[in-house]
Regions:
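Functional transmembrane-helix hotspots
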Residues: 103-128
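Short membrane-interface loop/juxtamembrane segments of multi-pass integral membrane proteins
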Residues: 124-145
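Transmembrane alpha-helical insertion/packing segments
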Residues: 1-66
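Hydrophobic alpha-helical transmembrane segments of multi-pass membrane proteins
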Residues: 53-60, 108, 150-158
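Membrane-helix interface/capping segments
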Residues: 66-85
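Selective transmembrane-helix segments that form parts of the transport pathway or gating/packing helices
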Residues: 21-25, 90-103
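Membrane-water interface at transmembrane helix exits
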Residues: 30, 34-38, 70-74, 104-109, ...
Length: 177
């Protein structure tokens, strides 16, 4: 009964929102940091070690953001949290982060670095090895790539966060007896 009252009083929404915004800003900063270090994650010829570093810095921090929010909310609830509440908390972070990362990718590709998508398209054309249909398809999609990239990132982060939230909620749940 006491846990239900605490759950009604303390909602994870504000915490999830703050963590998701922080992660989205971190993602943009990470893009520029990797560029500064000479690691272009859009380069198809990027060495495996650099790809792993970029993925760990991106997805690893995303996973930690979800788990951090679940643990913090569990502490707010007095050290107890139901599976459903832990999952909901993690999924809110994932959904918000997906939305914010998608919006920041739009900002990045349309305002901050419009040439980034041209580099990706040029690399895809080069990889097509003169296949006329592939080149024509890439050229047709060039103007819409920013939409697919932003939408794809939003969906990917949300779905990945859903899976992480399911797993971490099972680990972190602790109900009063």
């Amino acid at each position: 009964m006491e846990q239900l009252i605490l759950q009604e009083e303390k909602k994870p929404n504000a915490l999830a929102f703050k963590v998701a915004i922080s992660f989205a800003v971190y993602s943009i900063v990470l893009i520029y940091l990797l560029k500064l270090l000479g690691i272009d994650s859009t380069n198809p010829d990027l060495p495996i070690a650099e790809k792993i570093i970029a993925m760990v810095l991106s997805y690893g921090v995303f996973f930690m953001s979800i788990i951090y929010t679940q643990i913090t909310h569990k502490k707010e609830l007095g050290g107890y949290i139901t599976y459903g509440r832990a999952f909901s908390t993690g999924f809110k972070v994932a959904a918000y982060a997906g939305l914010f990362v998608g919006l920041l990718f739009i900002l990045y590709y349309k305002v901050l670095d419009p040439n980034a998508l041209d580099k990706i398209a040029d690399a895809a054309i080069e990889k097509a090895n003169g296949n006329e249909q592939q080149v024509k398809g890439i050229e047709m999609m060039r103007g819409y790539m920013w939409i697919f990239t932003a939408f794809g990132a939003a969906i990917a982060y949300t779905l990945l966060g859903l899976i992480i939230s399911l797993i971490s909620a099972a680990i972190l749940k602790k109900e009063r007896v």
